[in-house]
Swiss-Prot record:
Species annotation: Shewanella loihica (strain ATCC BAA-1088 / PV-4)
SUPFAM superfamilies in the cross-refs: PLP-dependent transferases (SSF53383)
Protein name: Serine hydroxymethyltransferase
One term under GO cellular component: cytosol
Function: Catalyzes the reversible interconversion of serine and glycine with tetrahydrofolate (THF) serving as the one-carbon carrier. This reaction serves as the major source of one-carbon groups required for the biosynthesis of purines, thymidylate, methionine, and other important biomolecules. Also exhibits THF-independent aldolase activity toward beta-hydroxyamino acids, producing glycine and aldehydes, via a retro-aldol mechanism.
Length: 417
């Protein structure tokens, strides 16, 4: 018999210590990685529930195993809430990740060798949008589009490439783009050549749910997202559509199961259901509004301090800091800030002369700092500390001073109070 008082601390002290140290790191470090966030204790409660024990291959009402009457309720709650949140008529909440959601879309809509128009990874796209090291770049003929000299998506180039190459699918969405995407313009281009429009909104899903960023669901044939990042739920993926095309919906479902996955993770789907309910609240909208305010405040402060922000600012939760003019590598900047308890990620910038393992930039995002309660004043103060470190990157005294300031600020704004 399994006893409820069983715990990790007594059974596996080594693992328990690692978990405790990570918990402390999250409380004592400022998190600026744009794709990271803090999920609620309610979501973690769902993920730690006995739902983890249940296999449920198939879909609600059409399972291959018995005993699914309760997990059917859980999955249907997640589906209906996702549809309400994004104005969709179809939702699949089973993908284990955003990348698996994306691979299901490829499988549902394309054949290997088909042409796909996707955003260049070096210009802000994602691995699954056609990078040669990813399945998408290996199995499909990828035509990349990018940004213009101002740092904005070049829709004229996109249209020219679409007309020239006639892709079967166009991809919108990004992992490092700070502007507003014109989903309607992309759909016009797709319709002009008879292509599917697939949007990966993983980075801005929370902003979209709160109405502070344009919703691609009314424009795209199919939309995918992660459920963490700005949405602040458990790590996982979803697929959405408002195309009112039952044949398309069947293809998407089949591409997830049995095409790409077996049993869904019912404890994670429960966490998704909780997160979607949280995202339907007025408090969530206020949070997302503050995310954008904080990101803009940070970008503006960097510019005032003489740093180069790609595209000159941000309209969402993230931006890229171009360090070429400062002659600092992203790798060195990442490491120096890490010693000051500020977590960022090195990132390639447009026309980056350095390798992806070194880079010339940083990607900075505001979702996590906003989640722990930072407002504009704290965002500006933090940005000035970052500038202090980067302006004198080898000065360990400055790094130590900033680290102490970070620890004081973190103590005032605990992640989990």
């Amino acid at each position: 018999m399994l006893k409820k008082e069983m715990n990790i601390a007594d059974f596996d002290p080594q693992l328990f210590q690692a978990i405790q140290e990570e918990t402390r790191r999250q409380e004592e470090h400022i998190e600026l990685i744009a794709s990271e966030n803090y999920t609620s204790p309610r979501v973690m409660e769902a993920q730690g529930s006995q739902l983890t024990n249940k296999y449920a291959e198939g879909y609600p009402g059409k399972r291959y195993y018995g005993g699914c009457e309760h997990v059917d309720i859980v999955e249907n709650l997640a589906i209906e809430r996702a549809k309400e949140l994004f104005g969709a008529t179809y939702a699949n909440v089973q993908p284990h990740s955003g990348s698996q959601a994306n691979s299901a879309v490829y499988m549902a809509l394309l054949q290997p060798g088909d042409t796909v128009l996707g955003m260049n990874l070096a210009h802000g796209g994602h691995l699954t949008h056609g990078s040669p090291v990813n399945f998408s770049g290996k199995l499909y003929n990828i035509v990349p589009y990018g940004i213009d000299e101002s740092g904005k998506i070049d829709y004229d180039e996109m249209e020219r490439l679409a007309v020239e190459h006639k892709p079967k699918m166009m991809i919108g969405g990004f992992s490092a783009y700070s502007g507003i995407v014109d989903w309607a313009r992309m759909r016009e281009i797709a319709d002009k050549i008879g292509a599917y429009l697939f949007v990966d909104m993983a980075h801005v899903a929370g902003l979209i749910a709160a109405g502070v960023y344009p919703n691609p669901v009314p424009h795209a044939h199919v939309v995918t997202s992660t459920t963490h990042k700005t949405l602040a739920g458990p790590r996982g993926g979803i697929i959405l559509s408002a195309a009112n095309d039952e044949d398309l919906y069947k293809k998407l479902n089949s591409a997830v199961f049995p095409g790409g996955q077996g049993g869904p993770l019912m404890h994670v789907i429960a966490g998704k259901a909780v997160a979607f309910k949280e995202a339907l609240s007025p408090e969530f909208k206020e949070y997302q509004q503050q995310v954008v305010v904080n990101a803009k405040a940070m970008a503006n402060t960097f510019i005032e301090r003489g740093f180069d922000v790609v595209s000159g600012g941000t309209e969402n939760h993230l931006f890229l800091l171009d360090l070429i003019a400062k002659d600092i590598t992203g790798k060195d900047a990442d490491a120096a800030l890490g010693r000051a308890n500020i977590t960022v990620n090195k990132n390639s910038v447009p026309n980056d002369p350095r390798s992806p393992f070194v880079t010339s930039g940083l990607r900075i995002g505001s979702p996590a700092i906003t989640r722990r309660g930072f407002k504009e004043a704290e965002a500006v103060e933090l940005t000035n500390w970052i500038c202090d470190v980067l302006d004198d990157i080898n000065n360990e005294a400055t790094i130590e001073r900033v680290k102490n300031q970070v620890l004081e600020l973190c103590a005032k704004f605990p992640v989990y109070g």
